From Swiss-Prot:
GO terms of molecular function: structural constituent of ribosome
The gene coding this protein: rpl10e
Keywords: Ribonucleoprotein, Ribosomal protein
Keyword Zinc on entry: no
Organism: Thermococcus sibiricus (strain DSM 12597 / MM 739)
Keyword Magnesium recorded: no
Lineage: Archaea, Methanobacteriati, Methanobacteriota, Thermococci, Thermococcales
One GO term (biological process): translation
Protein name: Large ribosomal subunit protein uL16
């Protein structure tokens, strides 16, 4: 079955369904690597991507953003000059009740009888202003980190913004952007 458009699954309109033991065949997470680059490095700045609205982000979008970030930063900055961390985990199991369509569909389709649905993927549930991912870099690579964040935000089905923090965790976005 084809992958549905992300706009179907992005809204957080129902409570999270946390009873995984009732869902037969729940898929495993596609994203397995949450830290890349140089985690032991000492970096001056931390750039974080935040959501502007409550949203569900599918694991496919998280994996696409991860590969895009890794490719861009490795090529332009070098693997030892950055560290990024994905801060969300896809817990929510997405389900779909496949409806039969076409000729004689009423003969073999179930309609709304037993409509629990089959699992089709996983998603991460995010609140407003929650961090999605974080990149740590030094001053000379800050422009590349901001460009990488813009590229990663295009993979998500929501409006995103970034914040720049120093080592102590103070928000210095306006001060740094005025000097760039």
């Amino acid at each position: 079955m084809a992958l549905r458009p992300a706009k179907i699954d992005r809204y957080v309109d129902k409570p999270a369904y946390t009873r995984r033991e009732y869902i037969r065949g729940a898929p495993g997470p596609r994203i397995t690597i949450f830290d890349m680059g140089n985690p032991a490095g000492d970096f001056e700045f931390e750039v974080s991507l935040h959501t502007a609205e409550p949203v569900q982000i599918r694991q496919n979008a998280l994996e696409a953003a991860r590969t895009q970030l890794n490719r861009y930063l490795s090529k332009n900055v070098g693997r030892s000059n950055f560290h990024y961390k994905i801060r969300v985990y896809p817990f929510q199991v997405l389900r779909e009740n496949p409806m039969a369509t076409g000729r004689k569909a009423d003969r073999y389709g179930n309609g709304m009888r037993r409509p629990f649905g089959k699992p089709i993927g996983l998603a991460a549930r995010l609140k407003k202003d929650q961090k999605i991912l974080t990149v740590r870099v030094n001053k000379q690579h800050l422009k590349f980190a901001l460009a990488a964040m813009k590229r990663a935000s295009m993979k998500f089905p929501c409006k995103c913004y970034y914040r720049i923090y120093d080592k102590e965790g103070n928000d210095i976005t306006t001060k740094v952007l005025s000097t760039l």
